[in-house]
Amino acid sequence: MALLKEKFASLPEFLRGPVLACIKNPEADPFFRNAPHLLVVHAKEGAVTPTEDCVAACAYFDILMQGCGYGTTWCGFLKMIVDAVPEAIDLLGLPRGTPFYAMLFGRPDVTYLRIPPR
């Protein structure tokens, strides 16, 4: 969060609101929604379709976790933050310019009733 505070003026307008909420209330978590786990998928250097590889891996992980009773959400905010502040990728331990995407997952707090199969 310190890096985002430092780079606040250079952030795109749509990221300033959530960052400001975190600055005003350190308990707020508009980016990760208090999810217990973060999965970061990245492509190898030299991959033919690195972005598509990351999306496909996340899609399969999403299906797998749903089948195991976990809730998932795609974490586009992390990608937007790294796009706006490239040095933030260092916090993930990835080389700069590495294609990646992230997902949050954990046991859901709520359950949804579904209509029965027909």
Model regions: which residues?
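Residue-level signal for pocket-adjacent positions within structured domains
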Residues: 27, 83, 100
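Glycine/small-residue-rich phosphate/adenosyl-binding loop
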Residues: 1-50
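Solvent-exposed alpha-helices and their adjacent loops that cap or buttress functional pockets
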Residues: 30-34, 91-96
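Small-aliphatic-rich amphipathic alpha-helix that forms the alpha element of a beta-alpha
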Residues: 37-89, 103
